UniProtKB/Swiss-Prot annotation:
GO terms for cellular component: apical plasma membrane; brush border; cell-cell junction; cytoplasm; membrane; plasma membrane. The modification Phosphothreonine is found at residue 523. Coiled coil: none annotated. Changing residue 197 to I: In NIDDM; abolishes transport activity of the transporter expressed in Xenopus oocytes. The gene is SLC2A2. Residues 1-10, 120-127, 180-187, 239-303, 360-368, 422-433, 483-524 are cytoplasmic. D-glucose binds at residues 193, 314-315, 320, 349, 412, 420. This is Solute carrier family 2, facilitated glucose transporter member 2. CDD domains: MFS_GLUT_Class1.
């Protein structure tokens, strides 16, 4: 009998759970590759002439029947009226596309507060089943969007899918953390992020024009996530409920033991029960803290502000601008096959997510965050230089492409996973739920801002757009250097002392045993 025994039930349960994480990634990446074909359909539905030569040249329309009939004179003379209509039409399409992308984050932002509540109210398994209803509704709206007002149906569908992902982004890590053996909790916990980046990559591959990313099949590409929702719902009936939920929340010791026996593969689960008993006693001895108290209580103010800044830094780094709009960025950079370059980004993202699993356990959280932000800053400079000088030197397109690949790599080394680790490690059991909720909300809010505004910023700044992100990255790198303490291998008392040095405020101490539960008590 070993603590790190991997059973078939455990593997099956983790894979089933991260199917939700997979959709999270799928919904992030799926909107990228078919951008031009969906925009052309928006124009068709709204009766807006597709007279943008660049748009026509950069996307192959299957037939002239797909476009609204437009008559042109042999010698057209543009009038102020016509120019105003063209500008207004272009602005309308840009707005609708930005909403199509960003509405996903609106849903996530709204639901991020309720994942923990839903899990505690219904249980982890039932909560994921209920969340799948949202996933299926969103998939149906997008899958049938070609039959109606596509822009409205896609925006509504992505909003509802965002609600699902907002719930699942809290439910899946919580469930995996509660079913995993202590020795495997860190490794299995990374499957959530790995499934997300795998979903991004798969959506980019099947979004290729010759697969589903074409005028005939793009709506199937968007609605395909409904299949995953049905599959996961069926598989969840064979998964055990979280033993921690059964024991700590419901006081069902017999059912908790049954669940543990299935997951561990042996009958003597006394050690797990004793650990949960201690955790329940720790939780009951500490008063819950509200979101308002995080900001009004001097003990928590500095940690929550630093936690929020880490999440703001993650999103305002420009990474989701890459994920949402990489095809158009590569197109601007002069890459002849931008969609394939986008798939390359997804592959690099997945590889370095796997690498980060080992780095996070070996190196300090703060160190990795600093390395990641510094590397992204340098890459953003090279991206912008490549775009600015592209007209003079054609080979600069490769500079921009390599810089984007490295940008994503540095993100996954530090700024991608680290904020979630550190927020959990900043706070003990009492304030942690509120801290994680407000951190998730701020993350989704910044995600929405980037998704909505990136296209406008890119249009306004042109090739200089990543100079703007470089400035933001530099500012957050300096903030991290001066304000963020190291948490790896430290107890709450030691982390509190670090914050006290930086702000002069005291943070409530807590026993180091809980840091062991979080996987943060390794020696440096």
């Amino acid at each position: 009998m070993t603590e790190d025994k991997v059973t078939g039930t455990l593997v099956f349960t983790v894979i089933t759970a991260v199917l939700g994480s997979f959709q999270f990634g799928y919904d992030i990446g799926v909107i990228n590759a078919p951008q031009q074909v969906i925009i052309s359909h928006y124009r068709h539905v709204l009766g807006v002439p597709l007279d943008d030569r660049k748009a026509i040249n950069n996307y192959v329309i299957n037939s002239t029947d797909e476009l609204p009939t437009i008559s042109y004179s042999m010698n057209p003379k543009p009038t102020p009226w016509a120019e105003e209509e063209t500008v207004a039409a272009a602005q309308l399409i840009t707005m609708l596309w930005s909403l199509s992308v960003s509405s996903f984050a609106v849903g996530g932002m709204t639901a991020s507060f309720f994942g923990g509540w839903l899990g505690d109210t219904l249980g982890r398994i039932k909560a994921m089943l209920v969340a799948n209803i949202l996933s299926l509704v969103g998939a149906l709206l997008m899958g049938f969007s070609k039959l109606g007002p596509s822009h409205i149906l896609i925006i509504a569908g992505r909003s509802i899918s965002g609600l699902y992902c907002g719930l699942i982004s809290g439910l899946v890590p919580m469930y995996i953390g509660e079913i995993a053996p202590t020795a495997l909790r860190g490794a299995l916990g990374t499957f959530h992020q790995l499934a997300i980046v795998t979903g991004i990559l798969i959506s980019q591959i099947i979004g290729l024009e010759f697969i589903l990313g074409n005028y005939d099949l793009w709506h199937i590409l968007l609605g395909l996530s409904g299949v995953r929702a049905i599959l996961q719902s069926l598989l969840l009936f064979f998964c055990p409920e979280s033993p921690r939920y059964l024991y700590i929340k419901l006081d069902e010791e017999v059912k908790a033991k049954q669940s543990l026996k299935r997951l561990r593969g042996y009958d003597d689960v006394t050690k797990d029960i004793n650990e949960m008993r201690k955790e329940r006693e720790e939780a009951s001895s500490e008063q819950k803290v509200s979101i308002i108290q995080l900001f009004t209580n001097s003990s928590y103010r500095q940690p929550i502000l630093v936690a929020l800044m880490l999440h703001v830094a993650q999103q305002f780094s420009g990474i989701n601008g890459i994920f949402y709009y990489s095809t158009s960025i590569f197109q601007t950079a002069g890459i002849s096959k931008p969609v394939y370059a986008t798939i390359g980004v997804g592959a690099v993202n997945m590889v370095f997510t796997a690498v980060s699993v080992f780095l996070v356990e070996k190196a300090g959280r703060r160190s990795l965050f600093l390395i990641g932000m510094s590397g992204m800053f340098v890459c953003a400079i090279f991206m912008s230089v490549g775009l600015v000088l592209l007209n003079k030197f054609s080979w600069m397109s490769y500079v921009s492409m390599i810089a984007i690949f490295l940008f994503v790599s540095f993100f996954e080394i530090g700024p991608g996973p680290i904020p979630w680790f550190m927020v959990a490690e900043f706070f003990s059991q009492g304030p942690r739920p509120a801290a994680l909720a407000i951190a998730a909300f701020s993350n989704w809010t910044c995600n929405f801002i980037v998704a909505l505004c990136f296209q406008y910023i890119a249009d306004f700044c042109g090739p200089y757009v990543f100079f703007l992100f470089a400035g933001v990255l530099l500012a957050f790198t300096l903030f991290t250097f001066f304000k963020v303490p190291e948490t790896k291998g430290k107890s709450f008392e030691e982390i509190a002392a670090e914050f006290q040095k930086k702000s002069g405020s005291a943070h409530r101490p807590k026993a180091a045993v809980e840091m062991k539960f979080l996987g943060a008590t390794e020696t440096v």
